[in-house]
């Protein structure tokens, strides 16, 4: 029951976090933990900022042994999580995160591409640990979901 409550609070926080970044309606993308980060959950809300896209992340955790303060690298790749392509946009001008009271980490980034372009194409979002924490992909989420795009 406690885990369900934590999950509910996590999703509510992620949704509200995305709403504060833009007056336009955002798109929520679930982040799936990789094998190196089993048991963790995450979400990113994409907001339309005109010619840019704002991204508000919330993740429940990182692999044990990750260096603190937690630094994460984020990328928008061409392709899907199952069939990844090259990096289309690296969002690493800052890599810091903020520890949340409800057992998780929040951070935000921006990409120099319109949200409509991301929704129309086949792109995925990758969250990677810092080099001193193994430089491993810990989450991935496909931007184009059922009902969106073609």
Protein language model regions, located:
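N-terminal leader/targeting pre-sequences
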Residues: 19-150
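Sec-dependent bacterial lipoprotein signal peptides
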Residues: 1-19
């Amino acid at each position: 029951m406690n885990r369900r409550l934590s999950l509910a609070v996590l999703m509510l926080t992620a949704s509200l976090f995305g709403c504060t970044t833009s007056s336009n309606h955002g798109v929520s993308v679930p982040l799936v933990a990789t094998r190196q980060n089993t048991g963790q959950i995450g979400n990113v809300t994409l907001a339309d900022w005109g010619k840019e896209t704002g991204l508000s992340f919330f993740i429940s955790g990182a692999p044990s042994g990750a260096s603190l303060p937690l630094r994460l690298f984020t990328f928008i790749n061409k392709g899907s999580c199952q069939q990844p392509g090259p990096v289309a946009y690296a969002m690493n001008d800052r890599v810091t995160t903020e520890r949340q009271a409800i057992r998780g980490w929040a951070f935000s980034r921006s990409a120099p591409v319109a949200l409509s372009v991301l929704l129309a194409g086949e792109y995925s979002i990758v969250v990677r640990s810092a080099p001193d924490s193994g430089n491993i992909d810990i989450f991935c989420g496909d931007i184009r979901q059922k009902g969106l795009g073609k």
